[in-house]
Structure formats: structure tokens, C-alpha cells
Amino acid sequence: MKLLKKYLLDILVVIVFAVISFVYFMPADMDGRILFRHDSAASKGLGHEKELFQQQTGETTRWTNSVFGGMPTYQMSPSYGSTQVLSQVTKAYHLWLPDYVWYVFVYLLGFYIMLRAFDFRQSLAALGSIIWAFSSYFFIIIAAGHIWKVWALAYLPPMIAGVVLAYRGKYLKGLLLTAIFSAFEVNANHVQMTYYYLFIILFMVIAFLVDAIKKGELARFGKATAVCVVGALIGISLNLSNLYHTWQYGQETMRGKSELVKKNTANQTSSGLDRDYITQWSYGIDETWTLLIPDAKGGASVPLAQNTQAMEKADPNFVQIYQQLGQYWGNQPGTSGPVYVGAFVCMLFILGLFIVKGPMKWALLAATILSILLSWGRNFMPFTDFFLDYIPMYAKFRTVASILVIAEFTIPLLAMMALKKIIDEPEILTSKIKLVYASFGLTAGFCLLFALMPSVFFPDFISVQETQALQQLPAEYQGPLMSNLIEIRKSIFTSDCWRSFWVIVIGSAFLLFYKMKKLGAEYMIAGIAVLCLVDMWMVNKRYLYDDMFVDKNVRDTPQQMTETDKIICRDKALDYRVLNLASNTFNENETSYYHKSIGGYHPAKLRRYQEMIDAHIAPEMQKTMKAVAEAGGDMTKVNGDSIFPVLNMLNTKYFILPLQGGQTVPVQNPYAYGNAWFVDEVQYVNNANEEIDGVDKVNLRHVAVADAKFKEQLAQSVKQDDTSVVKMIQYKPNNLTYEVKSSKGGVIVFSEIYYPGWTATVDGQPVELGRVDYILRAINVKPGNHKVVLDFHPQSLKNTEMVAYIGYGVLVLLIIIGIGVEIKKRKKTDAVSNRN
């Protein structure tokens, strides 16, 4: 009963969080409707082969051949035996709430746990949770289907809570919280978000260090640091399978360093990603005002005509054009919405800079500034270049605008510290009232100025790209159209300026009423909570709203099979590939749903495959389209051996070509080399450049090009004859079986993508795989009849799983110790109480 009484308010807060989360998604959650997310819909084909194989065999394959000729599944909803336990524990943490509802719930709960670790009272912690959880970006990523990112962001605050507890001297609680939530965090599988939050932790640890130096408590600081490190290591160990294989995979992807030596390296980073690619989505410098004013740049990249209020100012003559023009006019190529942290929250943050004391304030300010500067990306390249070149791992991630998640954490936290300071020391509103006015002026004042004089501060309401596009219109339309467009967008901007202004005015009124003792602390907190919740709720409903939810059957219905799909699927060959020339080949996974595609979409495709796309596959696609069209689809009139040899070596058996009216037609490729073949010769080269260049200098059906480092595995082949045959007799995505007949032996090339971890056996005896033609597997066999098996069951999986289960044992032991210590402490407390 005492325990229940102690935590009753916390339990009530958790219930309120669950109610808020349910209400946001009403009536969709009551109707059983689900969110139709483009990113999730696009991933159907990506994981379809993996899912089918699991349904049929009960086994999880770590390889699929459905996209990009073949790639690991480590970053396709990764699942390991060790993480299944974590999945069940996280469901309990979510209170088994339904999808979408629990996303918001864990946002709220996570920040609440952290603020309680900072020793905030329940009501203040609840308010802080609301203003953090309802930051617009967190709802935008739900709408976009970036669910791993949602999970990662939700688990970070409670992980930081463990760090805070450790540095406050509560070592065991800090250790357990750090271990559990770092395990949750790593399991969420969004390394980019975790990496960004490490900057926050670094700044906070520095603040704790400064405090320890001032108090002469370095020993205590060292102990707390050790506790945090041990907790993190336990959390990491539970996810070692996922972490290790993600790291290993990363070395082979576009995020790993290329072996090619490029002539123009100025745009390259050490990670292998181009600077332009990394910074493509960079926040505009003046776009940073969205933190205070959500529609400072128009909001999301949706048709302007969808904004009914703004269209009241539209010239009827241009309504059709406004269907094509976006509401957003910022620097990014496009956006699903702005980063808005709350207008009154911004004012409290500024106030916190004035009245909060101690190193933690400076740590949060430094992290905020860093986040904003890095979010500018290509708009502030000297600073960005420094991080790309010298800060470990920073160049591994693109979409630099998303680093604003740091500011979305630090701004609400310092804002809540300011409010806590006011409640703990009410006299501060009297003694430092000028600082309140200054904070009001620096936020509401700017909103007012922008609303009254938008063109003075923001002269550009039309992007450079839009200006160029509009110049294609007749000259007599350009002036009136651009003038009307500016007027519409000004109205969007000024409307939100006034909105933020009044939110800050109302919030400031709560502070003044508290100063005048017309409101108690709890009533002030409740009023601010309602104000901020309504403010941010309304903004979020612009980007995640009920009409986006559809009947569950829409998502679960299998992808519709086209006539082209049906024709190709009549081919009962075990394994062949399809090239869809009627789609955006390397930006879609629909083809992969029913076929093994040459194309696909994945943000981390294998680097060598991408390099082959750039050097050979993309040029061959253009030549193929032209040649097949000129031949009227008659492949006997197409010189396939010379026009598309790389596609042939990838066993591209079918091309899908576009027809008028959106229809498609399949064309069979008679030149495809098949699943495997003997070559007459292996031509060895000295480096990756010579290897990729050599591919189009030989007849790939008879000659293989290999890096000299594979000479020991492959040796040399011999001239073949018609009796040399390689036939696939069994296909599984992670296990391929071939029947080989050859009187001469030699090197067999497989039309399968080379990747570390694949093993080969000949008649049950292991042989070493080599890599040829830049991306394919090969082995050398002796004369005779053989059974060759290629298998992908990496030994590293067993090793990392063993470590993970040891980690579970350590964590369970710590939990038992923690419970024992708590029971002992309570007994001691009760004994003292009874004596008194």
C-alpha cells in the first residue's frame, strides 16, 4: 500500500499519457484503420521473398535475391533470436497498446522518466513530456512511416535518465536504466538517431564533469562514468548480432569506403558518400525560424491548392497552376513538414538562458547551437565539411536536417528547467521580471515584426527552382502570377506569425498570474500544459490526420499482379532476374514483389553494385531500350552479347518495357548467361579501377576479370568445350545447389552477388569463393561430376548470439540484485519508522 501511495501520481500521469495517445488517433484507432505510409508500402516488395521463405520453412534468411541482384537482409526488419526477448519486454513497456497509439505513448513516457530522474515533480515532468513528445517532427516521421526512427527517438530520453541517475549518485538505478534502455535503443535499429543523441550525452557528461571539478567530486564522477559505460556495454551486448552485422554490412555498402580511386575526389568523403548526397536535405538558414513559427517556409511540400484558407487570396485564373506549385518554398528539395518545438516553449528556452544557472545550461545551449549549425548542411559548408572530414562516423549519414532532433530535445529540457526555477523560486518573477520581458520580446516580438512586415525580413517567397520553372510561362502571365503567389504565401506565413504571437502572449499571462499569486503553481502548470498541447496538437494535425488512415485490408492485400507479371511467372526456372525498364528502376520495389529484380530501392545498397550501376548497368539499360525498340521487340535482331553483357552475366532473363497507356510488356532475353558457367580464362588485374574497367573489355561469357588478390582461390581456368555444364538443381535464397559436369574442370562463375559470409562446398568439402567481374562469385573445380553448394549461414551469427545471451544473464542478475537492495532498504526504513 505504501508503494502504491508513493507512485500513485506517476501511475495517474501514465494513464493520462495513454488517454492522450488514444485520443490523438481517434476515430481511426477505434475503427481499426491503419496508416497508409508510402515508405512502408514501398517496402512490401523489398522483404517479400524473405517473408515467404520464413512462412514456408520457419527459417529467417539473411539474404534475398529480390533486389539489386541480391543483398543481405540485415537492414530489412532485422530479427535475431536474442532480440526476440527484447521485443517482448518492449511490448510490456508499451503496455501492449496498439500501433500508432503506443508510438506517442512512449514518446511521452520516455521524457517523463528522464525529467523524473532530473528530480522534477510529476506535474512538471508531465508538462515537459507533452512539449517534447508533440514536437512536429516526431509526428511527421510517423506519417512518413519512419518507424525505426520513432522507436529510436522514444527510447533515448529514458536511456539518458540512466546517465542522469548515475551522475546523481544513484548508481544501481542508473546502471539498470542505462542497460535496459540502451538495449531498447540499439534494438530500434536507427543508428543515425542514436549517433546524434550521443552529442547530447557528451555535452551533458562534460557538464557533470565541470560540476564535479567545482565540488571536488572527481572520484564520484569516475564511478558514475564507469556505471554508464558498463550499462551501455550490457545494452550493446544484448544487440550484438544486429550491431556486428550492421557494422559489417556497412563496410560493403555505399556508406563504406570505395576501393575505386576517382579522379575528382573533392566531393568525396572518407565514408564513400558524396558531400552533395549527404547534404541534399539541408535546412535553410532562415528556415530555422520554423522552431518558433511552423509555417515560416510554408509547411509541407503539398499542392498549394490544398490550403483552402490561403487559396481565398488566389486569382481564379491561376488555380490550375496552384495545383502544381507546392506550399513549401524553402531550400530543401521537398519536405513532409517543418520542425516546430512550440512558440511558448521557445520563450521559456530563452528565459532559461537568463535565469537557469550551472554548467548544464551551457551544455544544452552548446548542443542546440551545434544542432542548428549542422542542420544547415550545404548552406554552411565550412562547418559541415569539418564534421564530414574529422568527426568519426558523421559522414555515414545523409539528410543532415534531421540533426535538429538535438535541438528538439535541448530546447524543451532547458525550457522546463526555467519553469522549475520559477516554481522553486517564485520571487525570480519579481526580481528578474525584465528578463521575462526580454524573453517575450525575443520571441513574441519577432513574431509581431514578421507579421507586420514580412517582406522586410523575408524577401523571398518563391524558390529559385520555382522562379526558373515559372519563366517558361508566357511573359504576360509571369508578373501577375508571381505577385499573386507571393501574396498567398505571405498570408500563410503571417497567419502563423500571429498564431505564435498569441500563444506566447497567453503563456506569458500564466506566468504573470502566477507572479501576482492569482494562480497556484499546479494551476499554472496545468494551464501551460493545455496551451502547449493544443498549440502543438493543431500543428501536428496538419501532417498526421485521420484521412491518412485506411482500412487494414488495403495494406495487407497482396500487390496486384499485372499481365506482365503473370507471363513472366509462368517461367518455372529456379532462378533468373528481371529488369523493369518501365519504372524508376532504382527507386522502386514493386518489381521485387514477384521477381528477382536488377533494380530496387534501399538506402544502403551494396557499394560495388552501385558502382556497377554507374559504370555499366545504367548505360546498358539505355542501349537496351533503344535497341529493343528499334527491333520492334524481336530479340533476334538485337546484338545482345555486345550491347548488354553485364545484364547477361547477371542472368537477366526478362526485360519489362513500357507501352502506351501505362501498360507494359515482357521481352525475353535469349542472351542471358544462366545461373552459372565455366570460363576459358581468368584475367587478373591489380586494383578495383582496372577490374571495373576490364569488365567491358572482354567477352564475359568466356573470360572473367578478377582482382589479383583472388589468384590463390581461383588459380587459372582452361579452355572449355560443350560438355562442361553447370545446372542449378535447388534454390533457396540462402542456399543454392548446382550439379556440375566437366571433363576439364576450371573456374565456374555464378550469376550471384559476392558478399563476405557466403561459403562454398564441392561434394561436401569446403572451397574458397573468389570474386570476379567486380560483383560475382566464382570457384575453381576439378574435372568430373560434382555437387556444388553455396550457403549463407555466417558463423558470426552463432558467436554474436552467444554473447547476447551472456548479456541477458548479467542483466537479469543485476535486476535481482537491484530488487534485493530495494527490499533491504525498505525493511531498514520500516524498522526505523517502527522504533520512532
Please report, for each region that a protein language model flagged, where it lies by residue.
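Transmembrane signal-anchor helices characteristic of membrane glycosylation enzymes that use polyprenol
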Residues: 10-46, 231-245, 370-374, 446-452, ...
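Membrane-interface coil-to-helix junctions
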Residues: 18-114, 130-153, 267-341, 374-384, ...
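Extracytoplasmic/lumenal acceptor-recognition loop(s) of multi-pass membrane glycoenzymes
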Residues: 54, 59, 65-72, 79, ...
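Hydrophobic alpha-helical transmembrane segments
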Residues: 97-111, 337-352, 407-416, 499-507
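Transmembrane-helix signature of polytopic, membrane-embedded enzymes
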Residues: 115-134, 172-175
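Contiguous transmembrane helix-bundle modules in multi-pass membrane proteins
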Residues: 129, 145-154, 166-183, 191-193, ...
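Polar, glycine-rich mid-to-C-terminal structural blocks
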Residues: 223-283
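Active-site-proximal, structured, solvent-exposed surfaces of multi-pass membrane proteins
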Residues: 347, 653, 662, 702-836
